[in-house]
């Protein structure tokens, strides 16, 4: 009874807030407006696929090195991923006509930029003096005016896992360090060293200390060379059917954001997956004609068959036990590719070709039906053509690809600004069950650019500045088996979200209904319909230095049985000038099982978007402190505890904790010099 009473108190704790008319305010529990913006766009599909984390890192990097609007190129504007296609076009046109602008406030003249978007722009752009020469700076200027940043992190668990006692070769602390040198948007040099809990440090295979290093050099605007990358980098072309090592567009983000453009970006991630290593360059060979060439060689982790062929390519990056270490860097991957793109009067046409070879043949286990058409062999190639027409009122984009499977994949999108307040979006895709690309990442329901056809329809309506309604419906058909469905299957996904803003209050309501087919008792029985309902109510309040957020999440899933889950959480924050900021949160969750799991955002560390998942019954507490003792030094500490009421052990296998609670402390320091 006490638990239920506490939940009611948490839900009603913000009931005394009074509303006023004004623009949207950044809510509690976020360090900035853009983090809350990303939170509102994220659903559990994006979180599990890693899209949210990828986008977070991109925006955090952009916040650290903002764009100078008076010297911004088309490529710079394309990096503002939170702008729609129409907003990008109108912003570019305005800057071309009115440079030099004197303040960001001038952008209010652009009709498509609402109050929220203008405030988002404030996070990532600034107005500097126009540079007529636009030449790459001298090395003397770079050495004198460049910025250094050193960032360190450690996570201390106040518990012991089974693997810590029996199998892991390293200590239980996770830590990483990152150094970066930057000269605005023109030059970035950096190195990251990362260590997962349980991995040996300066021991075993890690003679150089950390288990994983990421190093890069990225230069922009070197005359005709638009971008030059050395070391580790990520590449994206077209709509991602052939090459996309960056973030993918989810169903919610596709409704709001413009499709990311062709790009070469530095890889400063701690992840050991989805990056290239070598050299890449984008060159302007003629006005409005660019070409990109790249080459990569890197070691990869793999599970091998008895004949030394590759059974599975591993992307977890864990090297804690003898077994995991044996799979470390036991194969290599060589990749080369090229893209050419032509733009003229809003029309864009491009072509991409990618070739990949492995040191050992790929030979996956095809006894599972959903792996029947997985890539097999040693040498792989893919080619595609992408096309686009961009206009302030309408944008059309698409890509069609094939490869050595001789199968076809195509995706086509159209976005129409039907009126000043209404935008309509449609996305059609057809991915043959025989098509595959080792670097594809694009819009899909099943998470793969393979074995899927479907249609997505969405709308965003803003009847007035304080109200935004977003909705979509997506239908997908899988002609061959997929994970958890041994026969042809269908799914329908629907969402509606309403955001109401009356400063100092912001309210968000979200409801999602998803229907999909899955296996019944066994693979030979008929497929069973699985219905999933998810909802969220979020109330944010901000007044001067104080912020507060109340949130209620629910999940209701039916298949052969019902699974019900819900969570109510309350967070609050206080900021004292620029020196001290404190955020704290508490939540109670209760779910039947994993099917009704709940994800919720909480304040995390720098370069770490925190979106923990909960199932079972328990409570979550966290305290987040950030201080700046000097202008160039920032210290952050977070303590989080999860207490379960329905179990006396947490997790399983080597991750098992012989306790009903789990407490971690994270410490981070950032020094700019």
Model-derived features: positions:
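Bacterial Sec-dependent N-terminal signal peptides
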Residues: 1-25, 673
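Long, low-complexity intrinsically disordered regulatory regions enriched in P/S/T/G and acidic residues
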Residues: 20-63
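Alpha-helical interaction/regulatory segments in DNA maintenance proteins
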Residues: 45-60, 89, 97-100, 108-144, ...
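Amphipathic, charged-and-aliphatic alpha-helical interface segments
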Residues: 52-104, 121-126, 195, 199-201
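Transmembrane beta-strand segments of Gram-negative outer membrane beta-barrel proteins
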Residues: 138-165, 181, 185-191, 228, ...
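Exposed, low-structure sequence patches enriched in small/polar residues
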Residues: 168-172, 276, 329-364, 372-673
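Outer-membrane beta-barrel proteins
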Residues: 194-212, 265-272, 326-329, 401-403, ...
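Outer membrane beta-barrel
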Residues: 208-301, 416, 421-437, 576-594
């Amino acid at each position: 009874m006490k638990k239920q009473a506490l939940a009611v108190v948490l839900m009603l704790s913000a009931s005394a807030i009074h509303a006023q008319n004004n623009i949207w305010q950044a809510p509690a529990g976020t360090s900035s407006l853009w983090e809350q913006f990303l939170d509102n766009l994220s659903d559990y599909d994006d979180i599990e696929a890693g899209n949210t984390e990828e986008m977070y890192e991109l925006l955090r990097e952009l916040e650290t090195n903002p764009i100078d609007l008076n010297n911004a190129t088309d490529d710079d504007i394309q990096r503002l991923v939170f702008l729609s296609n129409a907003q990008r076009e109108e912003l570019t046109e305005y800057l071309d006509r009115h440079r030099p602008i004197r303040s960001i406030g001038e952008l209010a003249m652009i009709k498509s930029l609402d109050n929220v978007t203008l405030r988002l722009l404030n996070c990532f752009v600034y107005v500097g003096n126009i540079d007529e020469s636009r030449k790459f700076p001298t090395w003397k200027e770079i050495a004198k005016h460049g910025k250094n940043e050193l960032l360190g992190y450690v996570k201390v668990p106040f518990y012991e896992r089974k693997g810590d006692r029996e199998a892991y070769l390293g200590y239980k602390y996770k830590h990483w360090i990152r150094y970066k040198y930057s000269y605005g948007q023109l030059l970035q040099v950096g190195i990251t060293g990362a260590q997962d809990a349980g991995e040996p440090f300066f021991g075993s295979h890690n003679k150089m200390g950390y288990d994983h290093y990421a190093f890069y050099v990225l230069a922009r605007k070197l005359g005709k060379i638009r971008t030059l990358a050395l070391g580790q980098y990520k590449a994206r072309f077209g709509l991602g059917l052939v090459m996309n090592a960056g973030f993918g567009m989810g169903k919610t983000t596709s409704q709001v954001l413009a499709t990311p453009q062709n790009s070469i970006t530095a890889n400063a991630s701690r992840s050991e997956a989805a990056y290239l290593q070598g050299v890449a360059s984008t060159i302007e060979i003629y006005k409005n004609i660019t070409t990109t060439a790249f080459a990569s060689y890197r070691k990869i982790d793999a599970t091998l068959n008895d004949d030394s062929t590759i059974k599975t390519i591993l992307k977890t990056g864990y090297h804690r036990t003898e077994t995991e270490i044996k799979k470390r860097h036991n194969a290599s991957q060589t990749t080369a590719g090229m893209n050419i793109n032509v733009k003229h009067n809003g029309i864009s046409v491009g072509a991409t070709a990618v070739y990949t070879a492995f040191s050992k043949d790929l030979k996956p286990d095809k006894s599972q039906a959903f792996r029947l058409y997985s890539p097999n062999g040693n040498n792989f190639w893919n080619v595609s053509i992408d096309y686009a027409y961009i206009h302030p009122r309408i944008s059309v984009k698409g890509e069609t690809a094939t490869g050595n499977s001789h199968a076809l994949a195509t995706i086509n999108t159209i976005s129409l600004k039907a009126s000043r307040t209404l935008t309509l979006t449609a996305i059609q895709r057809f991915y043959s069950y025989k098509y595959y690309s080792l670097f594809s990442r694009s819009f899909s329901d099943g998470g793969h650019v393979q074995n899927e056809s479907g249609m997505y329809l969405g709308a965003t309506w803003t009847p007035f500045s304080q109200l935004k309604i977003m909705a979509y419906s997506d239908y997908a058909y899988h002609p061959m088996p997929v994970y958890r469905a041994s026969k042809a299957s269908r799914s329908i996904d629907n969402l509606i979200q309403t955001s109401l803003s009356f400063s100092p209050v912001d309210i968000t309501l979200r409801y999602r209904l998803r229907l999909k087919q899955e296996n019944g008792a066994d693979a030979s029985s008929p497929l069973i319909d699985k219905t999933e309902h998810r909802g969220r109510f979020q109330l944010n309040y901000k007044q001067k230095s104080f912020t507060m957020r109340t949130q209620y999440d629910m999940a209701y899933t039916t298949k052969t049985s019902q699974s019900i889950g819900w969570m109510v959480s309350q967070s609050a924050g206080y900021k004292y000038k620029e020196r001290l900021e404190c955020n704290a949160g508490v939540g109670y969750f209760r779910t039947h099982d994993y099917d009704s799991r709940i994800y919720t955002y909480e304040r995390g560390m720098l370069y770490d978007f925190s979106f923990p998942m909960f199932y079972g019954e328990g409570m979550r507490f966290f305290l987040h402190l950030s201080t700046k003792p000097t202008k160039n030094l920032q210290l952050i500490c977070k303590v989080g505890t999860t207490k379960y009421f329905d179990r006396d052990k947490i997790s399983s296998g080597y991750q098992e904790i012989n306790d009903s609670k789990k407490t971690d402390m994270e410490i981070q320091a950032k020094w700019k010099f």
